[in-house]
Amino acid sequence: MFLARHERSAHHPPARTLAGRKALRQSTLERRYDFHLGEAFRAALQGSHDKAAGHSSQALLISRELYAGTADPTRHQPELAAALCAHARYGGSGWQAIAMLAESAGHYAALAETDPMAYEVPRIDVLTRIALASDAAGSTPDAIGLLHEVVGMYLKAPAADQEERDLGLARARFHLGGCLLKTGMDEDGLAETEAGLELAADVLDRLRIRIADNGWLAEAPRYLQLAAPDWAAAAVRSMTLHAEAGRWQQAATAARAAIGVSGGLAGLGGDALRDAHEKISARAEEILAMRNGRGPRGTRTRSV
């Protein structure tokens, strides 16, 4: 009789044992998700895009399993939304990326209905990514239209972290500026870029972050780290355009931002980022010299 009971229990483990195994499996998946998504971000910041795509793919697979494997799918909806956005950025291309971003935006929209303070900004962030994907697919006018809408959304969005929201707005302005410049609207494009740079600098001040050395970005919030590549590119674009027009004071302001932000990225590691920082710094130092009245060979120049 004992053996019969033992055999039955072996074939049909108690419900609490099954629940415990399921909870352990879910906990393991959650840890693996956090690991792969974090590694995707880290690899992307270091310029290892293939590695970032591999990790974001794993994070997406895990998030789908978590989302499908619970009685309350909304519990893991944020993970799925974030993983879709990340993999669209690092592993997607063309309309495939836009499809993943649209799915991500749908999840964030549902989440924002119940908790706008937590999820409205991430929803708008995804719309920025959709605009960039549209631009990459050749639909720059559509991207410009969406980015104009996105800027307006950020300005009205509730946010648990106002600095994160405002840095998202700065990134949208960076990209809007780039798209406008691409279509020949130079004055408007530069104005949007400048507005983004000023807002990003203001966020740094509010966070009390000082760009003292190349290690500053490693201690910054994740959202600031992820914005840094777009920020550095915008600063380089601004300093270049102002320098070409002989506006040395404005060029110098952008040059200092370009040195600081590209230096922060270089401090995160990776030969490509260090090489980029060296090239950016060399050009920025030339611009700063011109601003201070010294030409390439020590000749005096007149500031504008």
PLM segments and residue spans:
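Residue register of alpha-helical TPR repeats
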Residues: 27, 32-34, 75-82, 118, ...
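Structural register within alpha-helical repeat arrays
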Residues: 32, 39, 80, 87, ...
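Structural motif corresponding to the intra-repeat A-B loop/turn of tetratricopeptide repeats
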Residues: 46, 87, 91-94, 130, ...
